[in-house]
């Protein structure tokens, strides 16, 4: 059964190889035009080409910078609007340290730390 599938594949592969051989003998440059070959450039032409490429690159980067300025920089905005637990904790610590002793004396319990667990329970928030 597999023998009957083999001859069409063989004929097709021979046809493809024959066509590929015909394409290799025909000149490819006439069909696609003259390709760019950097080895045939003089030194002055290569300098001009390099200068043009650098100029295009600088223009592309300038356009990208203008787009970023028009849209606004996303990095600084993201840092300002940080809502993670770590950021919120740092904000609260900063608020407590700036507010002074008034908040510490009124809102925070006096006994905090590892020694509190051995003592009796008190309601510090009343």
UniProtKB/Swiss-Prot annotation:
Organism superkingdom: Eukaryota
Disulfides per UniProt: 82-87
Record's signal peptide: 1-25
InterPro entries per the UniProt record, alphabetical: Calcitonin-like, Calcitonin/adrenomedullin, Calcitonin_CS, Calcitonin_gene-rel_peptide, Calcitonin_peptide-like
Entry keyword set: Amidation, Cleavage on pair of basic residues, Disulfide bond, Receptor, Secreted, Signal
Cellular component GO terms held in the UniProt record: extracellular space
GO biological process: adenylate cyclase-activating G protein-coupled receptor signaling pathway; regulation of cytosolic calcium ion concentration
Family matches, as SMART domains: CALCITONIN (SM00113)
Recorded family membership: Belongs to the calcitonin family.
Role description: Stimulates cAMP production in porcine kidney cell line LLC-PK1 via the calcitonin receptor (CT) but not via the CT-like (CL) receptor.
UniProt name for this protein: Calcitonin receptor-stimulating peptide 1
Organism per entry: Sus scrofa
Underlying gene: CRSP1
């Amino acid at each position: 059964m597999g023998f009957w599938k083999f001859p069409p594949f063989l004929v097709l592969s021979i046809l493809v190889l024959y066509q590929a051989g015909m394409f290799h003998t025909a000149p490819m440059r006439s069909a696609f035009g003259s390709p760019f070959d950097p080895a045939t450039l003089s030194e002055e032409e290569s300098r001009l080409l390099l200068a043009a490429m650098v100029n295009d690159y600088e223009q592309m980067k300038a356009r990208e910078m203008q787009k970023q300025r028009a849209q606004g920089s996303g990095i600084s905005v993201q840092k300002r609007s940080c809502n993670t637990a770590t950021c919120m904790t740092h904000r609260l610590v900063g608020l407590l340290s700036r507010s002074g002793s008034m908040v510490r004396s009124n809102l925070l319990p006096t006994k905090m730390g590892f020694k509190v667990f051995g003592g009796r329970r008190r309601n510090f928030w009343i």
